[in-house]
Amino acid sequence: MAPVEHVVADAGAFLRDAPLQDIGKNIYTIREVVREIRDKATRRRLAVLPYELRFKEPFPEYVRLVTEFSKKTGDYPSLSATDIQVLALTYQLEAEFVGVSHLKKEPEKVKVSSSIQHPETPLHISGFHLPSKSKALQETVDHGPPADGSENLEFSSFMFWRNPLPNIDHELQQLLIDGREEEEEEEEEEEEEDELEDSDDDGGGWITPSNIKQIQHESEQCDIPKDVQVGCVTTDFAMQNVLLQMGLHVLAVNGMLVREARSYILRCHGCFKTTSDMNRVFCGHCGNKTLKKVSVTINDDGTLHMHFSRNPKVLNPRGLRYSLPTPKGGKYAVNPHLTEDQRFPQLRLSHKARQKTNVFAPDYIAGVSPFAENDISSRSAILQVRDSMLGAGRRRLNPNASRKKFVKKR
């Protein structure tokens, strides 16, 4: 396996003890990755690395580019600041040593390919043998001679298509014949099953010590890297999705190239329209709040396939039917978000909280106190409304803070 020229390592590569000296010649990472590692054994290995670990910070323009691209793919909520910097460093090294002409600026659009077989139906599973249908049934089908003109006339006539009248004598004779035929068929089926079992044992599909390495490579969807200049070793699926959709090379912990990755889109289960804008809450086609996250597989050739879950809990309507509260007015009203174009109050701070005390300002007017007043008595202060410049909105300061949902009445 030819080593990659420049390899960017994520925290997962160090935690999994990947042989980076065999995977690449020049190993890069950022300092935040090393700070993330708290494992005692991993930090002990980092102290005595058998290769030179180079620290390099990505440029801000590449960080912005990767951030915008990850928002379009829907992986931005799953990425941390360190992950984005690792992606930006990979993009920067690719731009320096290879170029950016082959990289994609926009993610691939989802193409839904319809097939007769269910997408979740297993075809070739390593270690599992799916018995095929009996070939004896196909051999017993006799096509017979071609139909004559008289038969065609009979087929197109009215008497052929009318419901046949019941023939009791024929049915009684058929019952006597069926009893003998069933006994003969049971004996023949037992013989055929024994023959099929013998033939199935000789076939492939089983994991043996001789083919276990090949099956492991096939299950990982990996290839041996050839003529690869820059690659990123990561175990994060969100990072792998972004790298593959941008056209960058993704390396597994064992040094193999990853061919497939999984991304996500939003699909409306009301009108069945899809969108790659993961920031949407309401469907842009029907306007309902019926968008669900659907996984999409991205192959190495850029084709995408959607995978639907059979779990009934995914589309469980429980909790969707409830009485709406009475709409409230005022500057600080909190009403449920029902439509995309619904208007909400601005939730501005009080006049006292917006005052800035700057004694060196030319238009400063001395008041009772030269110090800034802390507003704690106004309605906005009680509701913990923040400044719009700092991201004011309809949410609590701490979304993880516990709050009482159900209060028992005494």
UniProtKB/Swiss-Prot annotation:
Gene field: Nob1
BP GO annotations: maturation of SSU-rRNA; visual perception
The protein's Enzyme Commission number: 3.1.-.-
Residue ranges with Acidic residues bias: 180-203
Chain positions with Phosphoserine modification: S199, S323, S350
InterPro entries registered for this protein in UniProt: NOB1 (IPR039907), Nob1_euk (IPR017117), NOB1_Zf-like_sf (IPR036283), NOB1_Zn-bd (IPR014881), PIN_dom (IPR002716), Ribonuclease_PIN (IPR033411), WRNPLPNID (IPR033461)
Keywords tagged on the record: Endonuclease, Hydrolase, Metal-binding, Nuclease, Nucleus, Phosphoprotein, Zinc, Zinc-finger
Function according to Swiss-Prot or TrEMBL: May play a role in mRNA degradation. Endonuclease required for processing of 20S pre-rRNA precursor and biogenesis of 40S ribosomal subunits.
Molecular function per GO: RNA endonuclease activity; zinc ion binding
Chain intervals annotated as zinc finger (NOB1): 258-330
Domain of life: Eukaryota
Record text on subunit structure and interactions: May interact with UPF2. Component of the small ribosomal subunit, ribosomal RNA processing complex (SSU RRP complex).
Pfam family, one: WRNPLPNID
Keyword Nucleus: yes
Taxonomic source organism: Rattus norvegicus
Family to which this protein belongs: Belongs to the NOB1 family.
The protein's name: RNA-binding protein NOB1
PINc domain sequence ranges: 5-108
GO cellular component, one term: preribosome, small subunit precursor
EC category: hydrolase
Annotated Zn(2+) binding sites: C268, C271, C283, C286
Compartment(s) where it occurs, according to its Swiss-Prot or TrEMBL record: Nucleus
Stored CDD domains: PIN_Nob1-like
Region (Disordered): 180-210
